[in-house]
UniProtKB/Swiss-Prot annotation:
Single annotated GO MF: magnesium ion binding
Assembly and oligomerization: Monomer.
One Pfam family hit: RNase_H
Entry annotated with the keyword Lipid biosynthesis: no
Protein name from the UniProt record: Ribonuclease H
Keywords: Cytoplasm, Endonuclease, Hydrolase, Magnesium, Metal-binding, Nuclease
Name of encoding gene: rnhA
Residue sites binding Mg(2+) 2 per the record: 10, 134
Organism of this sequence: Aromatoleum aromaticum (strain DSM 19018 / LMG 30748 / EbN1)
Residue sites binding Mg(2+) 1 per the record: 10, 48, 70
GO biological process: DNA replication, removal of RNA primer
EC number from the UniProt entry: 3.1.26.4
RNase H type-1 domain: residues covered: 1-142
Catalysed reactions, semicolon-separated: Endonucleolytic cleavage to 5'-phosphomonoester
C-alpha cells in the first residue's frame, strides 16, 4: 500500500524582497516532522515554493500526498498555470519569462515522483497546521537575520 502523507507549508518574508523563511509539517499517521529554513535576500513567493519543494524532496519513496498551502500562487501555479508555461517554453501567456522558473522546475520534478493533491487554505484564519507552518517560516526569517546567511533546521 502506498503511504499517505499530509503536508502543510508556508513561506514568509520580511520585506519583499528581503530576508525570508519557509516551513513545512509532514504528517503520516501519528508521525510528524517539522522542517524550516531561510534565505537572506528572497521573496515571499520563492519561500512559498521552497517550502513545498523541500517537503517533497524529503520523501524517500513515492507517496500519495495532500499538500496544504495558503499560497494561491503555488496552488494555481502547479495545478493550472504550469501546463501552459511548459507548452510555451517557460513563457507566460504574455510571452514574458516565468518568474521563479528555477523553483517551478524543481517543484515540477519533486511533485512528479508522487501523486499529489493541492489544497488551498485561507492563511491566518485559524487553520492550526497553517499557523504552525507560518511559525516555522518565521523561525527561518529570524535565523537568517541572526546569521546573515541561508539556514535550514
Amino acid at each position: 500500500m502506498t503511504d499517505q502523507i499530509e503536508i502543510f507549508t508556508d513561506g514568509a518574508c520580511s520585506g519583499n524582497p528581503g530576508p525570508g523563511g519557509w516551513g513545512a509539517i509532514l504528517r503520516s499517521g501519528a508521525h510528524e516532522k517539522e522542517i524550516w529554513g531561510g534565505e537572506p535576500h528572497t521573496t515571499n513567493n520563492r519561500m512559498e515554493l521552497l517550502a513545498v519543494i523541500r517537503a517533497l524532496e524529503l520523501l524517500k519513496r513515492p507517496v500519495v500526498a495532500r499538500v496544504h498551502t495558503d499560497s494561491q500562487y503555488v496552488q494555481k501555479g502547479i495545478s493550472e498555470w504550469i501546463h501552459g508555461w511548459k507548452a510555451r517554453g517557460w513563457k507566460t501567456a504574455a510571452k514574458a519569462p516565468v518568474k521563479n522558473e528555477d523553483l517551478w522546475r524543481a517543484l515540477d520534478e519533486a511533485a512528479s515522483r508522487h501523486q499529489v493533491q493541492w489544497v488551498w487554505v485561507r492563511g491566518h484564519a485559524g487553520h492550526v497546521e497553517n499557523e504552525r507552518a507560518d511559525e516555522l517560516a518565521r523561525r527561518g526569517v529570524d535565523a537568517v537575520r541572526r546569521q546573515g546567511a541561508a539556514v535550514a533546521g
